[in-house]
Amino acid sequence: LSRCYPWYLPGCQRHKASSHSLFRRQTPFPEVKKISGRVAVLSGLSGHIYYHWLFDVLPRFRVLYKALKAEGRSLKDIDYFVVNSVEKPFQRETLQRLGIPLEKVIESDRTPHFQAEELVVPSFAGPLDWVPPGSMDFLRKAFLDRAYLQRDQNLAETAETFGKRIYISRANAKYRHVLNEAAVVELLDRFGFVTVALETLSVAQQARVFAEAE
């Protein structure tokens, strides 16, 4: 339910819960904030990073939804949702797509120590960096829904701009750059590839571009 680095691979027998960084904390916790109502915790390790937000945090909504449905309840029965942050556009956009009002969101980055009247903590959908098929299906249904992608003319124009062959550039990334990217782009250009900087596109635009690519 609470992950920390370095994390272990599935089936690892050497992992000990006592090694969690929480138990090695030297500084005192901030003052506890008491929250009334039913609070669902969905934040995850490195949830501020696009990949971990998409494949670790968002699939917890599926786990939560299924658990609530089994009890005859729905997401509307949750008063607050705890996620890492809603600072970045992709976080706000994806939550909106899942029907989560931002006014019901608590950012764990800003409120790391709280006590809820009732706490709901769904498990992670799968091991860290090992995305289960159910999570992939959930994300596809949420963000590759044909009606959702076709209702916005801007999305269609975005896909047409980039075409069928795309190269994802990391030129603007903070880490893991392609050292000879200029040469790679020049080579791929001969084969009709168009360079895409994903950080300049919305999640919906990204989904449309990938859906239309070869």
Language-model region placement:
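The feature primarily captures lumenal catalytic ectodomains
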Residues: 1-214
